[in-house]
Amino acid sequence: MCDKADNHIDVQPEGNLEVSSVSSTRLYRRRWVILLLFSSYSLCNAFQWIQYGIINNIFMKFYQVSSFAVDWLSMVYMLTYIPFIFPVTWLLERKGLRVVALLAASINCAGTWIKVASVQPSLFWVTMLGQFACSCAQVFILGMPSQVASVWFGSDEVSTACAIGVFGNQLGIAIGFLVPPVLVPNVEDMGELAEHISIMFYITAAVATLIFLLVVFVFQEKPETPPSLAQVALRNMPTGQHSYLASIARLMCNKPFILLLISYGLNVGSFYAVSTLLNRMIIEHYPGEEVNAGRIGLTLVVAGVVGSLICGVWLDKTKTYKQTTLSVYLLSFVGMLIYSFTLNLGHLWLVFLTSGVLGFFMTGYLPLGFEFAVELTYPESEGTSSGLLNCSAQVFGIAFTIIQGKIIDHFGTLAGNIFLCVFLLIGSIMTAFIKSDLRRQKANQETGGNADSSVHPQHGETLPVKEVKM
């Protein structure tokens, strides 16, 4: 049982945190290289999540399996995440960013080469094995944007850096919507179809191999000097306070975080369901439009990329975490309603437009959830809070994909989309009840205030953060 004391995290700096250590915060130019590398292997992995689902009918024909079986090539990403996130988060706590990055890039690379060997109609199980390997790599990736941002970037950059980290994943999904319908056209000759699939798999494997080599030789654990006062406080924290199980227990007693955990899962789970079933929804109303289904998916994600970056910059400037998160959540609900009631009107241009509106807010919500969670749970590890958020998203994603798929089969796409609208409304209401306890901001202000009293004569003046070469 949780008492009131358990739900409180003291964010005051340790008594031995001297001004000299606080004033040594620095920003390294290499932080942008690290962020680019992370975004690159995240992109490669996310591309593979959706590469089957967006041409669902083509892979059904090639492997001679049901649409539900092809759906599982996407849902395996969600299923794998749930049991493996806890050991992976523990590994992140013990071994750090570099080990996790190496495992992510290497397992993802291995999965791509397994799929290269699966281009025969009788080898569906091999392509599932390769996809399973890639789904394991995803566990090392999905919760990392906020961790990379906090470890490498200053307090005025973390939200933007987190948004850029999420951007890599979103861009991978966007390419996954766009490229497979172009590389793998719906041809009748099975030999020709196998050749097209093989080309797609070989290109993916080559890119994954190059990224893996870059991670091996370039990716670093952390900067020598911390980039922010909050990171200084964490580095000065006694190691006993970094217990993973104790951290999980404290998070489970944090009521604002629990509300965010559920509402985040409802929103992102809805996005996973829409993305996985997009081909089926578009083809039902617009037969033969596989390529345009991919382009609609691209529109959905690109609009979300823009939304993510705008929201990240907005958070860095305003620090209005709850207000922004609630506004974007409500607009995601509105966007889903508009998409639901315009999908069957027979105008593809309208579907492109409504998908863009939906994507701008629904995908734009992703970095908001990460950063709001970090604020609510500081000084707990960013990887732990992000991992739990993503675990919630996977659970709801699997449930929503299966249930919405069955509803579409029996009652049509409108009923399936209304099903998601109901849960987005519930998530919006839950978000409104989250208490805005911005602990990381308090830590930066209080630590900075202590330093100001010793080295700055003017109230509110902050310590300079130096940017140095790589």
From Swiss-Prot:
Return any one Pfam family short name.
MFS_1
Record carries keyword Endoplasmic reticulum: yes
Those parts of the protein on the Cytoplasmic side are: 1-23, 95-96, 153-157, 219-254, 319-320, 377-384, 436-470
Alphabetical UniProt keywords: Cell membrane, Endoplasmic reticulum, Membrane, Mitochondrion, Transmembrane, Transmembrane helix, Transport
Which function does this protein serve? Choline uniporter that specifically mediates choline uptake at the blood-brain-barrier. Responsible for the majority of choline uptake across the blood-brain-barrier from the circulation into the brain. Choline, a nutrient critical for brain development, is a precursor of phosphatidylcholine, as well as betaine. Also mediates transport of ethanolamine. Choline and ethanolamine transport is not coupled with proton transport and is exclusively driven by the choline gradient across the plasma membrane. Also acts as a heme b transporter.
Per the similarity annotation, which family is this? Belongs to the major facilitator superfamily. Feline leukemia virus subgroup C receptor (TC 2.A.1.28.1) family.
Name of this chain's protein: Choline/ethanolamine transporter flvcr2a
Give the organism, scientific name: Danio rerio
Give the classification, highest ranks: Eukaryota, Metazoa, Chordata, Craniata, Vertebrata
